[in-house]
């Protein structure tokens, strides 16, 4: 009996610690990019996956203690895929008491009609889904659209564009929608996928499979994801350093003439960002930038159990 109580206390402690870290990550991203402002109505796009469930939970949590007032409305797009469990999200959201809207659009049928058998359907499906979500945001009077992409997604997109697209381009935490009418935010931009996975497992969210349409994972993205996971395992801190690099760009030491006026460098020009000192042997820190030791999720500090609960 005592052993069971100890395990339960340990689980509660670890969940609270994890939730605090996710809250901190989301709060920092919101502040850094001014994602949420006074009076905002945030449309939280809920797919039924671990990321969007976590995003909704953390935003609800922050809503209670934030110094500004904002409202949330959860939106799910039922695309009429075979086997889609229509009851899961409404039942879950009803238990939370969250305002929500289920949008029913047979995009699955449109995609099947337009795309030949065996060809990838993701591109057309994504465009259709995006248009519907933008329309829904307008109908609901939403000022921001929140998507559940996390830090790993952002890094994967950076490497996809580098390896296959020839661009240094990632996935911005905040942007103007392609129709020019909506601001899209990614509150999980600073969150690690493994933290989100642990949180979703601990909270036992009612996960809906993401491959009901029969589509296969993007092979190129999967290769990048495997590469990053391997690096993270073999070289602790590398992921943090790469993400820090995305926030610390030095255009004068790259090759994009649109970002820096290389032609304008003449005799008498000022030294920019250290000039050629960048090519001298630099002192490399013992630990990568932004790296912190992995926390042991199995440790239990019973003295702290009563003070770490997230309200």
Swiss-Prot record:
Keyword tRNA processing attributed: yes
Positions of transmembrane segments: none
Pfam family, one: ATP_bind_3
Catalytic activity: cytidine(32) in tRNA + S-sulfanyl-L-cysteinyl-[cysteine desulfurase] + AH2 + ATP = 2-thiocytidine(32) in tRNA + L-cysteinyl-[cysteine desulfurase] + A + AMP + diphosphate + H(+)
EC numbers for this chain: 2.8.1.-
Keyword terms of this UniProt record: 4Fe-4S, ATP-binding, Cytoplasm, Iron, Iron-sulfur, Magnesium, Metal-binding, Nucleotide-binding, RNA-binding, Transferase, tRNA processing, tRNA-binding
Cellular location(s): Cytoplasm
Binding site for [4Fe-4S] cluster: 122, 125, 213
Keyword Nucleotide-binding: yes
Cited Gene3D superfamilies: HUPs
Manner of cofactor binding, per the entry note: Binds 1 [4Fe-4S] cluster per subunit. The cluster is chelated by three Cys residues, the fourth Fe has a free coordination site that may bind a sulfur atom transferred from the persulfide of IscS.
Quaternary structure note: Homodimer.
Known role: Catalyzes the ATP-dependent 2-thiolation of cytidine in position 32 of tRNA, to form 2-thiocytidine (s(2)C32). The sulfur atoms are provided by the cysteine/cysteine desulfurase (IscS) system.
Miscellaneous comment text of the record: The thiolation reaction likely consists of two steps: a first activation step by ATP to form an adenylated intermediate of the target base of tRNA, and a second nucleophilic substitution step of the sulfur (S) atom supplied by the hydrosulfide attached to the Fe-S cluster.
Protein name: tRNA-cytidine(32) 2-sulfurtransferase
Gene source species: Escherichia coli O1:K1 / APEC
